[in-house]
Amino acid sequence: MLCYHAISDTWEDALAVPLYVFEEQMRAVLKRGYRPATAAETLSARGKVVHVTFDDAFRSVAQALPVLERLGIPATVFACPVLADGGKTFDVPELRPQVEEAPDELATMAWDELRSLIDRGFEVGSHTLTHPHLTSLGDDELRRELQESRERLEDGLGVACRFLAYPYGEEDERVRAAARSSGYRGAFALPGRQAADVFAVPRVGIWRTDGSRRVTLKTSTLGRRLSDPVASMRARWPRLARRREPVVWRERKA
């Protein structure tokens, strides 16, 4: 399971992988013998399978779809329903300095764009309602974030919302139990370690500085044992480890 965020040749942020690099990475993974699989198949698949995920549903992800279609690689885009309502910019504390500098890069998919993903054979999952730090929420707010986001996505897209991706990759036993009772089939985290719980499916975080060789290493058995993408992300954004500020949704300028 690979975890991406944005696809951009111009946004020089760790989250944004250039399109040509993304295609090189996909070809490198297939060359290593990984078999493309759906999100559901990864829950029980044995051997080398690959599924691509995109957290936050950035609009730039649309650039990657033709590459995935050509190579036959399934993907899931994880969206926050409050963003799909349109007119808002993705604004979290870690990215706040860039909101004014690169608002277009932080634009997210609206409902019609998410429906287009479904029509093209891709899957849309939940990234919670407002992208909070789930482990810091009370039980009632935690349930609301998980259950209401699933219900709103199902209402807006007309298909079942089967999977969840934890914001920031953060989860614990209480969060996993809440996800299980909120109607999901499985949930995806970010640690590189292997896990038997389908509500803590590990993913490998891919960043702008990861060329095809590094992705090859990260997806190797040794690389998966050694890597910890959450620690890597927190190293890039030190405030992530200690800040618990709420997400602020800003109206995008026309």
Language-model features, listed with the residues they occupy:
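Short histidine
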Residues: D104, D112, V215
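Surface-exposed, active-site-proximal loop segments in enzymatic domains
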Residues: G47-V50, F90-L95, L134
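Short beta-alpha junction loops
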Residues: P81-A84
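Acidic (Asp/Glu)-rich catalytic clusters
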Residues: L30-R32, P66-I73, M109-G125, R180
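Histidine-centered catalytic micro-motifs
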Residues: L2-A6, E123-P132
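Aromatic- and acidic-residue-enriched segments that line the glycan-binding/catalytic groove
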Residues: G86-D104
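C-terminal active-site subregion of NodB/CE4 polysaccharide deacetylases
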Residues: M1-F54, F58-Q63, R70, A75, ...
